[in-house]
Amino acid sequence: MSLANAGSGKSLDDKAKSPSVVVDPAQRLGQLNRFVFGGFVEHLGRCIDGGLFEEGSPLSDNRGFRLDVLELLRPLKLSVLRWPGGNFVSNYHWTDGVGPQSARPARPNLAWGSVESNHFGTDEFMGYCAELGVAPYICLNMGSGDLAEALDWVEYCNSSAATYWAQERRRNGHQEPYGAVYWGLGNEMYGDWQVGQLDAAEYVALASRWAKAIRRTDPNAKLVSCGQNGWSDWDREVIDGLVGLVDLHSIHIYSGSPEYWTDVLSPHQAERAISYTATLLARAAYNRGISVAPRIAYDEWNVWYRTSDGTLEERYDFND
């Protein structure tokens, strides 16, 4: 990339009035990891119900998948999709969302103050991932859930044995394991908005036990520790405590300021988060004598600057 006016003989004032940039597509700076192009869906507002999933709609197929939304998502060529949360997951019990939809119990959505029908559950999510050709990334409930529930979920998704939950998956119409590789160890467990909030020491102790047990259930699982913004004391303590047990460490960055320049400069905040997190990961791996440090899962980010009604539903246009 080069400045088009460089060396043109124009004055600085002239250049400032009509700046331009030339991009050379033949100039390669490096290989881009395809998992940069990931997505995240949560049971929040119209994201799932009334968004990508709407039973009985003329716009939906017989599974309830909105065909118009699928057609918009396919060209994005997403690589991985995270579900079911987000804050929602800390009160989500996956067994409510499998089996005949008519028999699934409705539950209170404590994160967002609504009622969850549970009609879009594990099998629907896996089917949606298959439609898009993306890898599923499941976040586990470390708020109100327990280790046994998590292990059962891994078994349901990935076991080829003749065990209870693998057989239940088969009874629900899915003979072969789904092969879900990516599993998040909770969501934002540091926050007082989270059901079952933990401090960093509590989280490390709990996540250590979960990580070891999950690897016994599925040695191929890739585990993601719950991070904050990449430079917090939480991140440092969690990374130090879980290095060697997890494959990735998550960070979440949102910009939500009504101030224009705060939002314009927010990419610097993201760059700083990535840089700080990478340093903490490398430091922890070096101190433990681990040759390969965990990688970064930047699995939540966005810009909100118009929404003020508490719904978190932003309305973007071409100005953005």
Where are the model-predicted features located?
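Non-catalytic accessory regions flanking glycosidase/transglycosidase catalytic cores in CAZymes
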Residues: 1-232, 240-247, 270-271, 275-299, ...
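Pocket-flanking alpha-helical
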Residues: 236
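Active-site His/acidic residue clusters
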Residues: 252-266, 310-313
